[in-house]
Each structure stands twice: as structure tokens, then as C-alpha cells.
Design a protein with these regions (language model features):
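Short, surface-exposed acidic-centric catalytic microdomains
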Residues: 35-73
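Short, basic, glycine/proline-bearing loop/turn elements
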Residues: 68-84
């Protein structure tokens, strides 16, 4: 099972965050995270007025509780920070945590700030969420489609079909993944 670390920008919109976490719940991949990542996510989500500070803190607390096994403690990567290459100190934290967390893929919309050749020396590939999810769907179609079905079945406000959920992911920016998932679901009972 692949270990992945996501940049903060992958954790919203919530449909994309939910998918990344659900893939971990169903053991399709392991989402590795750090306290720094969640703190940055809270700051951004509150600044963008998508959640209140207490609501964002509650979501982070739930991630800490339910995904505790995939946390990379600061002490495991702080010694790597000075070695990381990149213009943004927050991104250097993410790169160092990814290296210490032995991830295979660092997923980000901001490919320019994560030097692929540098991270490859540590065995880490950099991919955007659409490319990563397409690759995962190609390698594990039954599992990924199962996650989408389970997620849709759990949606209550508003209720969603699997196709509705795929549409939300399409609007979240993972258009190639959404198209591929829709094609695979075509003709199936969703």
C-alpha cells in the first residue's frame, strides 16, 4: 500500500480531502500527515472563511484521533529541514515530513515549489492530485470505485449517488480522474 503525503492545498475542497482520507480508511493508500500540515490547513481554511476556527480544530482533532498511526512527529523530520530545497518554509516542512514518513508520493497542486529531481533522491515522486488519483484508479480500480461507492452511500446532507460524488470531485479539479471513474462506473449500478 502506497504511503502518500499531501500538501495543504490538496485538503480543500472537502470532497478531495474526504476522498484522500477515505482511501486511507479502506487501506487503498496511507495518508501520512504532520502536525505542521494540520496547523497550516487550519490557518488557511479559516482565512478563506470555509470553516470557523472551532470547526477546523474539530476536523484536525478527528484526523489526529482516527489516523494517529500515520502521523510523522516533528522530531522525526526537524533534522531534515535544513537539507530541503524550496522557496516556501511550509513546503520544506512538508518535504521533510514526507521523507521521514517514507512516502512514495507527495501530492500537491503546486508542483513548481516541490523540486521533483531533489525529492527523487529520497525516493519521493511529486504528482498533482489528478495524476495521482488516475494512477491509483488504474492500479486498484475495484478498491477505488468501492471507496467512491461507500462515500456516496454515507452522504446525507445532501444525499449523493456515486455519480454525484464523482461530479463534486470533477468540480474540485480532478477532472481526468472524475472522467475515468465515471467511465468505469458507466453501466454499473451506482
Amino acid at each position: 500500500m502506497a504511503r502518500v503525503f499531501v500538501d495543504t492545498n490538496v485538503l480543500f475542497p472537502f470532497s478531495l480531502m474526504d476522498l484522500m482520507l477515505a482511501l486511507t480508511e479502506d487501506a487503498v493508500h496511507t495518508l501520512v500527515w504532520s502536525d505542521h500540515l494540520l496547523a497550516e490547513w487550519e490557518r488557511v481554511i479559516v482565512r478563506e472563511r470555509q470553516r470557523s476556527a472551532p470547526a477546523a480544530a474539530g476536523i484536525s482533532a478527528a484526523i489526529r484521533e482516527f489516523f494517529a498511526d500515520s502521523r510523522v512527529p516533528d522530531d522525526d523530520y526537524k533534522h531534515l529541514l535544513a537539507q530541503m530545497e524550496g522557496p516556501d518554509p511550509d513546503d520544506c516542512h512538508h518535504m521533510a515530513a514526507a521523507v521521514a514518513g517514507r512516502v512514495r508520493v507527495l501530492v500537491t497542486w503546486n508542483l513548481a515549489d516541490f523540486p521533483a529531481a531533489f525529492l527523487a533522491r529520497y525516493g519521493v515522486t511529486v504528482a498533482d492530485p489528478d495524476a495521482y488519483l488516475c494512477s491509483l484508479l488504474s492500479r486498484s480500480p475495484r478498491e477505488v470505485l468501492g471507496v467512491l461507492r461507500r462515500m456516496a452511500a454515507g452522504k446525507r446532507r445532501p444525499p449523493m449517488t456515486t455519480i454525484d460524488l464523482v461530479g463534486a470531485l470533477d468540480r474540485a479539479g480532478v477532472t481526468l480522474f472524475a472522467r475515468s471513474a465515471r467511465d468505469r462506473l458507466d453501466g454499473l449500478s451506482v
